Amino acid sequence: MIDYKPVVQKKNLKVIEQREESIYYNKKSEDGGCGGDFKCDTASVSGSVSQRACVYCGARVVLNPITDAYHLVHGPIGCASYTWDIRGSLSSGEEIYRNSFSTDLREKDVIFGGEKKLSAAIDEIVAEKHPKVIFVYSTCIVGVIGDDTDAVCKAAEEKYGIRVIPVKSPGFAGSKSTGYKAACDALMKLMGDKTTDEKIDGINFLGDFNLAGEIWIVTNYLKKFGIDVVAKLTGDSSYDEIMNAPKAKLNIVQCAGSMMYLAKMMEKKFGIPYIKVSFYGVEDTKNSLLKIADILGNEEKVKKAKQFVLEEESKIENELDYYRDRLKGKKAAIFVGGAFKAISLIKQFRNLGMETVMVGTQTGKKDDYEIIESITTEGTVILDDANPYELEKFILEQGADILVGGVKERPLAYKLGIAFCDHNHERKHALSGYVGSLNFAKEIDLTINSPVWDYV
């Protein structure tokens, strides 16, 4: 008989000294906690192998789901590899967003400049595709050689009478969060400076990218009690839809890391108030739906919303009880991009009778970590911008049974011999709303209680 041993033995792993301020054991605020000297939302420590992506990546994942937009990457062809299907975003209409274009800058262009090549690429797209809007992304090399993409885009707009929006996203200018801001700036530029007194009785849904059709789940919920969605930013959205966004009465923001900047700009320019929401998990889905109904609805809409929530919860409660019995007492580790998702995941695990023993994000802010501290138990490891070495250390130290993360974390979990759940934007199954809560419980049960772990 083969003597199976753990894939990785526990060992004394240490973290980089400069990273210690971004790692905190929850002591329930006896020393100031995450509201004290906890360091987050800063540049990554050099050499720490941060899991964050570049500025261009951040801008691209936000803008790419606009279904009828053309995306032109001004840079080497390698940058254009990060294009097709980078999110599992679905469309109810156009599929243009699944195509991508590149100026394919070479050594000669680096020396003599790439503006003429960019202008020619725009000319070709207009001649062959007749676009309504083109987003032009600056990459690292463009930031180095100093091509004036603003001037090229402005000239193209005047020449063709269409929108050509520069996205200032050279990768070395920051991290993925900087790219989010670049994308928000591009969206504001697209919507323009004109204000309007005309309002539509509905909401804009910011920070949902229609992964596996999740935005359709939520919009169908809202329709049940009479709330219309004016524009979706940016999952399953279109140019015409986005141009209507300034007319909405309320912005709801799910992924605050990527879209809070836009929500604040829209409040300042168009007078649209915003609220944070999350449709991950039974608890947050309920709270978000009732909050929206309370703000926008009359007494009848609020009544319908409460009735809808009760009906949906009753449909899945028995099945959730089944999974609670199988998962009770298990320990979870979380490392995701956005803090809103981490907060919802902690609540979901708690609802399933599981304890979160480690939680980290790539883009969390101080107030996000204060919330995380308040809803986790004493001893939970809280960390910002972690690297694989740190994840390994605290997963082993805390005895986690499962890691929830993205594709970059999957190999680490399997090497450590623990279960894994993909909650990133590459996934193809819905985890939002009530149906998503049930799907999540099923997936956690399948991976934690898989017989494969008997052989590890």
From Swiss-Prot:
BP-aspect Gene Ontology terms: nitrogen fixation; protein-containing complex assembly
Pfam families, per the entry: Oxidored_nitro
Gene Ontology MF term list: nitrogenase activity
UniProt keyword list: Nitrogen fixation
Keyword flag Cell membrane: no
Entry-linked Gene3D superfamilies: Nitrogenase MoFe cofactor biosynthesis protein NifE, C-terminal, Nitrogenase molybdenum iron protein domain
Pathway where it operates: Cofactor biosynthesis; Fe-Mo cofactor biosynthesis
Disulfide bonds: none
CDD domains registered for this protein in UniProt: Nitrogenase_NifE_I (cd01968)
InterPro entries xrefs: Nase/OxRdtase_comp1, Nase_comp1_CS, NifE, NifE-like
Family: Belongs to the NifD/NifK/NifE/NifN family.
Xref: NCBIfam families: nifE
Functional description taken from the UniProt entry: This protein may play a role in the biosynthesis of the prosthetic group of nitrogenase (FeMo cofactor).
Identification of the protein by name: Nitrogenase iron-molybdenum cofactor biosynthesis protein NifE
Source species of the chain: Clostridium pasteurianum
Gene: nifE
